[in-house]
């Protein structure tokens, strides 16, 4: 553990310790909390910029509100490292995102101070509204519910759906809009802070309500004029007309790094007797750490780094990551086809589409955190003859499943889905694991579902998708590097629904769907050394299956094992159903499917987790030896 000097923070284990401090100590506490956060993340890696941006807000919220009785719900959750330090988890903060350590997000089973788990964006207001309504039903009049949501997350429709509902219900809910990017209405110094304090005071609210009651007794013409005049004045001075229309009482904008501004406003809104309130705070990602302030995008998620220089520790490698291979392949295809366009949902760098945007800026569309819109937007482009590639993480594609079915699949529109971060993703854990895309896509009629076994196969699949116009098509690939093979300038077009055999044998058939192929080949070597002749097949397609190849493998082998990084119901399940329908399970063939277990996988090292669940060479060999009844003796 690094020797960070934090004498005041050392006195705070839980929020009640924080609330025992004089208010004049809080600036020093915030500075120490920021120092501790920087030092901890330098050891573990993780999300840095977002947490540094809410240090003062975190201190203020736990100081003003009676947590955990009052509920603070953090949207997404990657900004909660300071929150974790203040809520009894400082001793474990240097285990963040490590196996057996703290989650990088909020997690209900981890602490009573995490009332709602997160990892995906834009859920906090809906969850908070549910809790606020539950408190009202139970007549818990003292409990406050606070949802903290970033301006980026406000680009998702779900946030506005929740606000609309909260306004209609007149629920006692406090929403903190953490504006650290869009600058909807940046604060303008002391005047803005003064106005925020003014409009948050009970006296202003009571006056406003009395004027409203009086105006309602006047003819409608006068009431409409009065309402519009007030909206104009408040919108001109302090913003917030949109939120007013949704039924929220708007306060702000205020400086989210100035405790002298935050504390009085939060005290005032804490006592607001009824209806939802929105407090607009403006913050800066990476606040207080110059390298992060200078490059907030690069310090959103970081590897371990040197605190003094800010230099991140990265393993040197000349092997391209799968994301980079996809990016280069898509740019190459777009050079040959002017109908190709790229679409991302607020992840241009993570999906590699930033390179596409540099080359074809007019054909690149970042729609914000709006996966549902992204898919239907792509469907509209496909209707007009364009070839949209929707590049999206597997875990986020789940958010657009109705659009995939209703707007794309039923209409057989040729939308291309480039599914990044497929399979186990490591430190981000269950909320980000790409476990389910094979299952929920391969069940759709006439939906082509592909997975490459290496980076060259990924290039082939990008070109295949670009050439395919008969309906929707997808290809999935993992986080991390390929295997380091030489790559051509451009991939080849694959025959739809046709796999390939990499190695011929006659007793054991190993059928791989995806990038576990290197482990499958190692397993085949070990089985061969034990006298078990092994065929290795690259399925390429989960849908449509290569039926001819699967029939041959079933008829010519004693044991057939499928290998995939995905949940129950994926490639192995589809192959088993085909074999059953064909009567190929009735003549002694023994089939096993290696996949994810029926549970959510927690954060940890990908190599260790995949080994534990049997998706490495040793696990494959053990499975085969168990089936054939041999004693397992592995070196």
From Swiss-Prot:
Thiamine diphosphate binds at residues 78, 119-121, 152-153, 180, 289, 371. PANTHER family: 1-D-DEOXYXYLULOSE 5-PHOSPHATE SYNTHASE-RELATED (PTHR43322), 1-DEOXY-D-XYLULOSE-5-PHOSPHATE SYNTHASE, CHLOROPLASTIC (PTHR43322:SF5). InterPro entries: Dxylulose-5-P_synthase, THDP-binding, Transketo_C/PFOR_II, Transketolase-like_Pyr-bd, Transketolase_C, Transketolase_CS. It catalyses: D-glyceraldehyde 3-phosphate + pyruvate + H(+) = 1-deoxy-D-xylulose 5-phosphate + CO2. GO terms for biological process: 1-deoxy-D-xylulose 5-phosphate biosynthetic process; glyceraldehyde-3-phosphate metabolic process; terpenoid biosynthetic process; thiamine biosynthetic process. Pathway: Metabolic intermediate biosynthesis; 1-deoxy-D-xylulose 5-phosphate biosynthesis; 1-deoxy-D-xylulose 5-phosphate from D-glyceraldehyde 3-phosphate and pyruvate: step 1/1. Mg(2+) binds at residues 151, 180. This is 1-deoxy-D-xylulose-5-phosphate synthase. SMART domains: Transket_pyr. Belongs to the transketolase family. DXPS subfamily.
